[in-house]
Amino acid sequence: MIDLLSEYRMDPTTWLYVASLMTIGIYFRFHRLLSIRNLDLIGLIAFAPGLLLIFHGIEAQGYLWLIAVSLLFLPRLLIDPAFSRRPLTEPNLAPGGMAFMAAALMFFLTANILTDRAVFAGGPAAGGGSDKVAAVRRVPMTRGPGFMPFYRAISLTRDHPGGIPPGETGGEAKDQRSAPSLVLRAGVKAVAIVCQFAIVLGMLFFGLRHFDNIQTGLAAASLYLLLPYTSLMTVRLDHLVPAAFVVWALASYRRPVIAGMSLGAAAGIAFYPFFLVPLWIGFYWRRGAVRFGVGVLTALIVLIIILLCLPSDMRQLQLDLAAMFGKGLFRSEGADGFWEFYPAVLRIPLIATLAVLAGSLALWPAEKNLGNLLSGTAALLLVAQLCLIHQSGLYMAWYAPALILVVFRPALEDRTAVRAVPPRPFGALPRLREP
């Protein structure tokens, strides 16, 4: 099977045109050209040129393009709760055709992951290309803040130039490295596939349980799979793992403990989802805040226990604990991506803006509904990934699923914590009217 897929590769530029035309044909509302839905779709398509510029080595302009499009979406997300009339708008494709397309896209995405050659930091680029372009598709060697053992495990960097320690022949080094490198390569790809399935299934579940319409969830998941970003950044676990946890935190919002554990895991791994915690506490303030806090603390305690169980000295343990809770947030050395070409000092007011935005969304409005939670989560993660010192603007998986769900969501005014969350931790879920 792998041999049959080994030559599978679609040029990114070709896929940009194909995916853009499919997005317009399937989702565009041709009878209302200036609708919010159509503008959202045009905005999602507009990310693709920036990605192509980056993958063709024109990084300064490419990252600037991504940042600009991201900032255009920010006011759209902040004013989304004001759009009270949200009629259900189905895609232009029948449910059976939509399901087939989603399954086909997932199959080819899996094939893309299995045949990806840009897993090791010293490996060749998938489909050729320069080392600079290939590096975009691999985890940066120096990271932080976050769960550093996770980043060390998925970076897969070699300790010596060319991967061959001094004093060893190429054959000896190959014998010593072949088994672990195969295991690590297979492990990264397996986790990437699991994360992509988790994101897609989470969006399907969200549509079924919270929109009461499986076709809407299917349309949202298919649009995520159609994004050129999804096919280009296939094995970046620093993108996918936090994204999968955030999606399932949203999907399980009616169970505060589970939502808290999912969000706590995302925050413990990538740190920046910590900025979501005030918003979620504000959502659960009238019911479920304590349970949500218990879930977040449980996930963080589990990650700390994992740190304690890993073989390391006390100094390394202290550094990893500090990085997990924000040490290195304002670090500017080793910048790559957007902040490699533009003054990194601008990150400081950007991080301050993120903190102010997190506090503001936590306080207003006083009673939040699921629509506020969705749009606020997408907005905060959109700004958070702009603050990254590494490849700022490229971490679209963090916010893209929530953003797409915002695009498709119906009216959700009655989905408040008081109405949707059971009064007891393991109580039956209250019955809600259809949106």
Predicted regions and their residues:
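Short, intrinsically disordered terminal tails adjacent to the first/last structured region
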Residues: M1, P410, D414-P435
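Primarily membrane-embedded glycan-assembly and transfer machineries that use lipid-linked glycans
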Residues: M1-L250, V257, Y284-M396, A400, ...
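Transmembrane helices and adjacent periplasmic/lumenal helix-loop junctions
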Residues: V257-W285, I389-L394
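Composition- and surface-driven signal marking solvent-exposed, interaction-prone regions
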Residues: G260-L263, M396-P401, D414-V418
